[in-house]
């Protein structure tokens, strides 16, 4: 039965996405992280790195214990209630539909010829400056975001959800939220965010690399370039400043036949990141559509293979 929970959650996300009227649990994790930061930063006697470690432990521990308590309480109430709560918690941990909606908004603006609107929409997906991007720059930023978030927002929580249920998925979401809030190499967070960044790197190590296999499978199904996926990853994945993000980004670049990376601007400061991909194909609205299709098919493959392995394992343990 456990192997059915994640597919049910995935289907629910495809149908509903993230309801705007309901406060997403990730926001609660973010508020908890902000409160923990204020608490431990206020303890002046603590070294910043230790304060950051304690913050990460409190946030991750509280999140996992809360999720476990909700699931156990629901199952004690009724087995069906336990299943429903588990599926809902898993549903809130993944975001393929939300990623598709953001990518679609950028694509539709480009198709309509509204570059300014496209810049505004892609700014909701990336942290770089978007005000001066041309059409190709907007498309590149959107594709890079879809690629990276295929791992961060879909396959990684799928991986931990399949392995450890709702608690595993939310262990990952708490880690990822901490990294997005504190994992910066600036004066404020270089020491405080050290633990959050390192733990997120650890949590993403396997999922990011397994995502490459899913992208290659999706590229085969979509008649793109599965061989290009592996060539691109071999040549460029480790060049990325992140130990993990380069894998899905290089995989997408290879499958779509484009190059990602290059010059980016953050707060008015231009930064050059390594170029990923083998061919310099044009990037436009159509490329964004291709990236979103790749994301969906790769996610379904990842989930289906994981659920199948879990089913086989459960049957072998029963026999």
Swiss-Prot record:
Span of the signal peptide: none
Name of this chain's protein: Cobalamin biosynthesis protein CobD
GO terms under cellular component: plasma membrane
UniProt keyword list: Cell membrane, Cobalamin biosynthesis, Membrane, Transmembrane, Transmembrane helix
Membrane topology: Multi-pass membrane protein
The keyword Transmembrane helix belongs to this UniProt entry's keyword annotation: yes
GO MF entries: ABC-type vitamin B12 transporter activity; threonine-phosphate decarboxylase activity
Pathway note: Cofactor biosynthesis; adenosylcobalamin biosynthesis
Gene Ontology BP annotations: cobalamin biosynthetic process
Cited Pfam families: CobD_Cbib
Keyword Membrane applies: yes
Family stated for the protein in its record: Belongs to the CobD/CbiB family.
Residue ranges of the TM segments: 57-77, 80-100, 152-172, 210-230, 294-314
Stored HAMAP family: CobD_CbiB
Function: Converts cobyric acid to cobinamide by the addition of aminopropanol on the F carboxylic group.
Gene: cobD
Cellular compartment(s): Cell membrane
């Amino acid at each position: 039965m456990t192997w059915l929970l994640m597919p049910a959650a995935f289907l629910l996300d495809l149908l509903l996405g993230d309801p705007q009227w309901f406060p997403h649990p990730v926001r609660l994790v973010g508020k908890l992280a902000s409160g923990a930061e204020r608490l431990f930063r206020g303890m002046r006697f603590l070294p910043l790195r230790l304060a950051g470690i304690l913050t990460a432990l409190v946030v991750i521990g509280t999140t996992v214990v809360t999720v476990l308590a909700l699931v156990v309480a629901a199952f004690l109430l009724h087995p069906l209630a336990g299943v429903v709560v588990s599926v809902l918690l898993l549903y809130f941990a993944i975001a393929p539909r939300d990623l598709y909606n953001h990518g679609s908004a950028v694509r539709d603006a480009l198709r309509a010829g509204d570059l300014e609107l496209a810049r505004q929409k892609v700014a909701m997906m990336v942290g770089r400056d978007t005000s001066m991007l041309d059409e190709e720059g907007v498309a590149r930023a959107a594709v890079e975001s879809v690629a990276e978030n295929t791992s961060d927002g879909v396959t990684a929580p799928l991986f931990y959800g399949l392995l450890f249920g709702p608690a595993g998925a939310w262990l990952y979401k708490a880690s990822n939220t901490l990294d997005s809030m504190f994992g910066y190499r600036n004066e404020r967070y270089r020491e405080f965010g050290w633990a959050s960044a390192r733990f997120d790197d650890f949590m993403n190590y396997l999922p990011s690399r397994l995502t490459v296999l899913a992208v290659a499978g999706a590229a085969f199904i979509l008649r793109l370039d599965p061989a290009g996926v592996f060539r691109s990853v071999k040549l460029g994945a480790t060049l990325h400043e992140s130990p993990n993000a380069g894998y899905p980004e290089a995989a997408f670049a290879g499958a779509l036949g484009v190059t990602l990376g290059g010059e980016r601007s953050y707060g008015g400061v231009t930064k050059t990141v390594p170029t990923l991909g083998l061919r310099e194909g044009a990037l436009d609205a159509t490329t964004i559509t291709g990236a979103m299709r790749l994301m969906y098919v790769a996610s379904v493959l990842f989930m289906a293979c994981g659920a199948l392995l879990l089913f086989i394992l459960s049957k072998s343990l029963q026999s």
